[in-house]
Amino acid sequence: ALGVMVKQDLEDLGMKVNFKPVEFNSLVNKMTNTNDWDMAIMGLTGTPLEPHDGKNVWTSNGSLHLFNQRPNGYTIDDRLDWEKELDEIFREGALKLTYEERKPLYDKYQTIIYNQKPIIYLYSPIRITAIRKKFKNIFPTSLSGLIYNLDEVYIN
């Protein structure tokens, strides 16, 4: 349904779209092995509690690094400057132990992603959340869900 809606929206803007749904494993194979695709709709998941979980998407050699892909034979030396910076941030982030050391790094990575926009997020699902009154300092968001600030939640 989402693909049909995106196709219609793009056609309304004057673009010609050949929408062809494919089985998930075939899609992943095309995107990661053959580079035989122009545009894809895919859901990426992760936890808002650990920013390093995004390493497989945001580092230039990550298994789901689906933008600025390089044909076989190209080396990592042809990375864009901001991709090199992301690689370094994730390398450094893995070596830091404290929140105070890690937060500036992952804040910077989010700023780079915001500025470069290598992926366009189309939507966030509607969620219905129920919270018992005894839990305090919980503020669900449409993007981060319920537990983005788990370290600040308490029971009264």
Spans of features found by a protein language model:
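A local structural motif
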Residues: 8-22, 85, 92
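Hydrophobic alpha-helix feature that most strongly marks membrane-spanning transmembrane helices
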Residues: 11, 15, 32, 45, ...
